[in-house]
Amino acid sequence: HCYTSYFILYVLYFKMKRFRFCFVASMLLLVSASAFAKELPAKIQAAFEKMYPQAVNVEWEQMAGCYVAEFVMDNREIDVWFDENAQWVMTENDVESLEKVPAPVAEAFMESIMSSMRLKDVRIITFPKHPTIIVIEVEVYNSNEEFQLFYSPDGKLQQQLNVSELGGEIYPGLFD
């Protein structure tokens, strides 16, 4: 009977220890997430609010050395990138269809062999110092092969990337 009590205490001790670990781990995750929100420099927040004063439910993350604001506006997902000096780097608008891109881009894509693939995503990327780029992402049917096609607004294909292994993440370094 005594051994049973010790066993129960032993089990409770380790259960509490595991619970304590999970509790501490979840609190650390919460603190680190809120710490990032506190770390967002005021000048970056101000630069963003100047560009998008009507944006709500903005989520921030750090990527490729930049601060990225993610939000939805007019039923479109928008990512706005700023460098550490609060300078606007680029904006990515997820427009999701060819109907929302310049006609020469849609025509050039439809005339290409890539149009036979499944259309996965369409994004318009704007920059302060570079021309606009339209990125069309396609996927080979019944395959894991994915490609990104980079067009100028006049319909000229600038670049084609196989992103099968990389994923389709767009970041400023792709355009340097």
Question: What is each model feature region?
Answer:
Residues 1-40, 48:
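Bacterial Sec-dependent N-terminal signal peptides
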